A protein has these predicted regions:
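Surface loop/turn motifs at the tips and blade-to-blade linkers of beta-strand repeat domains
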Residues: 1-3, 53-59, 104-109, 161-167, ...
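Beta-strand-rich domains and repeat architectures in extracellular enzymes and scaffolds
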Residues: 1-37
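Beta-rich catalytic cores
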Residues: 6, 35, 62, 85, ...
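Blade-loop segments of beta-propeller domains
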Residues: 8, 26, 32-80
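Residue-level detector of Asp-centered blade-edge/turn motifs that repeat once per structural unit
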Residues: 13-16, 69-74, 118-121, 176-178, ...
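Short, conserved, GDST-rich strand-edge loop motifs in beta-rich repeat architectures
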Residues: 21-36, 80-81, 126-146, 229-240
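Asp-box/WD-like beta-propeller blade repeats and closely related beta-sheet repeat scaffolds
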Residues: 57-65, 69-70, 74-138
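Loop/turn-rich, solvent-exposed surfaces of beta-rich toroidal or solenoidal domains
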Residues: 212-240
């Protein structure tokens, strides 16, 4: 889509015929120009130019992954935000006019957050793509494909770890019945499948599916099929 720089993730609200795209020019940030990112809305039927739905937020906004809890006339959008003082999950309500910011979740466990999937208006799972701090240790984690990352769960009141031992936890999503959580392990080149406990939110490993490529974002269609983006050249991905 023209006009969108640095797209990190996309979700589609089928009932509204609308796509939401999280974008942030991270290369500009690396060059010292910390420009604000945005959530863009795109009408899949009209095909008009995408529209910035977050032009006047009152806080730094550098989005990464995002997740949708759809309802017929709207729903909830949760977005990973890399604020200068730490990662947060921003919660937006979908309205006829666009998006309304309705809350922020922060906490010490939200470090190196990559993606998020909501399971209720106030509950979510988030993937943490690294366990090591930035610098040499993180470089070793990437190039040695060390399984130091994981998943945290927010129950509406507090965060807690629910999965670990994953090599670069990236995209995360939910099965249509809510019974399984899928996590893409980019440097592990596999998909982790967990059984989900619906009341407490705990995850139990079910299986790992080796895919032989650097898996990234996961989309689940209405029939339960998984559509997974991938980076076949892992060294190029890690260098990026």
């Amino acid at each position: 889509l023209d006009g969108i720089v640095g797209a990190e993730g996309m979700v589609i609200h089928a009932a509204l015929g609308r796509a939401f795209v999280a974008a942030w020019d991270r290369r500009a940030g690396a060059a010292g120009r910390l420009e604000a990112g945005a959530i863009w809305g795109y009408d899949l039927e009209a095909g008009a130019a995408p529209r910035n739905l977050t032009p006047e937020l009152s806080f730094p906004f550098h989005p990464h992954g995002l997740g949708l809890l759809a309802q017929d006339a709207g729903g909830i959008l949760m977005v990973v935000n890399h604020r200068p003082r730490g990662d947060t999950i921003e919660v937006f309500t979908i309205t006829e006019a666009g998006l309304k910011h309705s809350g922020t979740v922060s906490g010490d466990l939200l470090k190196s957050v990559n993606d998020v999937v909501p399971v209720a208006p106030d509950r979510f799972y988030a993937s943490l793509d690294h366990g090591a701090p930035k610098g040499f240790q993180r470089m070793l984690e990437d190039y040695l494909r060390l399984p130091l990352s994981g998943v945290v769960y927010y129950d509406g009141a507090q965060l807690r770890p629910v999965a670990d031992g994953i090599a670069y936890a990236n995209g995360i999503n939910l099965s249509p019945d809510g019974g399984k959580v899928y996590v893409a392990a980019t440097t592990g080149r596999r998909l982790h499948v967990f059984d989900r406990e619906p009341f407490e939110g705990g995850l139990t490993p079910r299986k790992e599916i080796f895919l032989g490529t650097g898996v990234d974002n996961i989309d689940v269609d209405g029939a339960g099929n998984l559509w997974i983006a991938a980076h076949p050249k892992l060294l190029s991905f890690v260098a990026h």
